[in-house]
Amino acid sequence: MGVKALGLLRKPKTVSLKQACAAVGQGQLMMIYQKLFFEYHKTAAQVLLTFDVVSSDERRHNAINTFNELLQLDVVPVVNENDTVGIDELDDSVTFGDNDTLSAIVASMIHADLLIILTDIDGLYTDDPHTHADAKLIHVVEEIDDNIKSMAKGAMSSYGTGGMSTKIAAARIATNSNTDMAIVS
């Protein structure tokens, strides 16, 4: 969203410009979420995390407490990586930083029953449905093996950092924590 708001024609290459775009885009994103949830008489809260929430027991504990309080207050937490300070997602050479993985980590932290990841594809296909008309939708995956991982290869959007492979990696994190996961459009 920040790329578009700043009038840039393509995804930035430098980390500092990506951070600036993230700072602009995050505010716009929250305005949209606030408006949408307000229509359902719900309050949305912005929770920006960095991946050190996994490595620091204190930060993890604080994050869990925040999520628990928000949920007790019937507030919908809108979670995103804090891309203005956490640059893993912005550095194309790093593969760990993406919102799919972050969502699975959060679902695991709060012991969620279900994680739903939204995407522009209906779910996992035998091949990339954007380029292969004969690709078939896989409705249920019981186990993530090498065959499933190979199906997850493929393109991502021009502005995205994920793709189906990050969703499959997120599914592994979620299911290892007894959280079911759905990939839907």
Q: Which positions does each model-derived feature cover?
A:
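Conserved glycine-bearing catalytic or ligand-binding loops at nucleotide- and phosphate-handling centers
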Residues: 182-184
